[in-house]
Amino acid sequence: MIPVVIEQTSRGERSYDIYSRLLKDRIIMLTGPVEDNMANSIIAQLLFLDAQDNTKDIYLYVNTPGGSVSAGLAIVDTMNFIKSDVQTIVMGMAASMGTIIASSGTKGKRFMLPNAEYLIHQPMGGTGSGTQQTDMAIVAEQLLKTRKRLEKILSDNSGKTIKQIHKDAERDYWMDAKETLEYGFIDAIMENNELK
């Protein structure tokens, strides 16, 4: 169930679902697994807010275990395409594809709450049973290409070398807020609405 907010206006009461009310303040909630429907919703909100006023920041709150690479990269490409600055605020976790999205916010405007976590690792994929050997080779080659592309994005977003990203992402690499700041994925830790 989605909570409803009731506001008093000069024309009487107006009710909004909470996400529509947040959108009015240029806040987008990216929560749950990254998949096509969620990505389409996030992209539509980014485009709408940018068309409304591209001189104001958009606030993207992130709490996701990650998910689809193609859906996540569609969000990242849209963030880079629009003129509005996109502030990212990680709460809970930004894991896997969530790290790519959260670290792709406008440099200087990437934040994290003190108890949130970041996770980087190599992309996952596979083939089902009954897959032909040739198809397995194609999938393996595509996974390697995807890994290189994601490592380049993480390197650009953090300032770390691709070699360092490759080494750290070999297995699950968890970071708390302080470690994420030191790594270069965020620009500050937010505590009580203040930057640390």
From Swiss-Prot:
It comes from the Bacteria. One of its GO terms (cellular component) is cytoplasm. One of its GO terms (molecular function) is ATPase binding. Keywords: Cytoplasm, Hydrolase, Protease, Serine protease. Fourteen ClpP subunits assemble into 2 heptameric rings which stack back to back to give a disk-like structure with a central cavity, resembling the structure of eukaryotic proteasomes. It comes from Streptococcus uberis (strain ATCC BAA-854 / 0140J). Cleaves peptides in various proteins in a process that requires ATP hydrolysis. Has a chymotrypsin-like activity. Plays a major role in the degradation of misfolded proteins. It is found in: Cytoplasm. It catalyses: Hydrolysis of proteins to small peptides in the presence of ATP and magnesium. alpha-casein is the usual test substrate. In the absence of ATP, only oligopeptides shorter than five residues are hydrolyzed (such as succinyl-Leu-Tyr-|-NHMec, and Leu-Tyr-Leu-|-Tyr-Trp, in which cleavage of the -Tyr-|-Leu- and -Tyr-|-Trp bonds also occurs). PANTHER family: ATP-DEPENDENT CLP PROTEASE PROTEOLYTIC SUBUNIT. Pfam families: CLP_protease. Disulfide bonds: none annotated. Its main location: cytoplasm. PROSITE patterns: CLP_PROTEASE_HIS (PS00382), CLP_PROTEASE_SER (PS00381). Its EC number is 3.4.21.92. One of its GO terms (biological process) is protein quality control for misfolded or incompletely synthesized proteins. Belongs to the peptidase S14 family. This is ATP-dependent Clp protease proteolytic subunit. The active site is at 96 (nucleophile), 121.
